[in-house]
Amino acid sequence: MSHPLIARAADREVRQAAAFRDAAAAMTGESLRADFEIEQQNAPRLADSGRAYLVKRSGKPASERRKTRDLEHLGSALLRYCREKGESLALPEESGTLELLDYQVRVKGARADDPATRGIGRIDLLGLIDGQRLAVIRMRFVEPGARRCGVGDTPLHVLLDGLAHTAIASACRENIAREVAERFGREVSPDPPVLIFLASPRYWELCRKRSAQKGASWIKELTRLAGEIETETHIPIQYLALRLQGDPGWSYDEQGPLLEGKPLLSDAWEPGADRVKPKPRARARSVAPVEEIVEADLSRPARVYAFSEQYLAGDRISHPVLGEGVVQGLAGDGKIRVRFDESEKVLVHERVASA
């Protein structure tokens, strides 16, 4: 298989909200490293066809929103904001900066339906960490008022797809670095690229709502995979949230998409979100006491019921209305329980007869 990570990303269990956690649990950094290396070996080489990764765009810019092109328009707006402000995006916890280079970066020269490269798309955003290390950014956007994510668009699917595109960028790093140096005057470090999974807060919220304990189990697995993948491939993985101002967060002018305010990057989830709470122990079901039926003591003679008489458990009595019965025991002061056929009645005894 030429592109095993692309194939994994398209797997049915990977794309199912109810199944992707188990699919992630079955994966290891070692197995994904093998797939990553195959992706590198079979990576399309855009430079071989004489085409550039970083291109100067021409034509009329977008003037209105199309939801099917939200990622493209958001990427354009982010890049425009950073260039007009002359600044990079701050990574969470002052861990560095992210300088954006281009959006919707093409990585293959073949047709979209070419079997050899089917499933390989464009890189949503390409950037530099601290002005040096290449960053491949895979994005997902869900507007603040959305009630659901896209069908089949699970975090594991995006992670595997992003890892495949990072493998391509890693294989073509020298050509990309040369273009970055020529166009931006930046020297790209020889370190492997960083993969950033960047999504709107609502995307993360909806993904977590679909799972128990706010997604703790799948967050745990994706966190584990990120650590194992970095150990095996030296590709760091960051899960981040992109906070925008407004809804959806950008508008349009004559130059195209324009952010409505400063974008902020934060961690995708809070510390401890991957802590899975143990299931509470099942409570022992209370068992209803088994009713014990006192059998008649045949050694005692049957007696006609009279409220002034004293009766003990096992006594046989004959009631003028209820018929034959067996005393089961006391039912309180001056009362007895008597079983007649399948029913039980409470009668009085030891009562003093009135003069």
Q: At which residue positions do the language-model features occur?
A:
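Charged, terminal alpha-helix-loop-beta segments
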Residues: 1-288, 312, 329-330
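Mixed-charge, Lys/Arg-rich low-complexity intrinsically disordered regions
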Residues: 279-313
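A general marker of short, structured functional hotspots
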Residues: 32, 49, 99, 161, ...
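A short linear-motif detector with a strong N-terminal bias
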Residues: 174-176, 218-219, 295-298, 304-307, ...
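Basic/aromatic-rich interaction segments and small domains that mediate binding to polyanionic partners
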Residues: 304, 313, 320-355
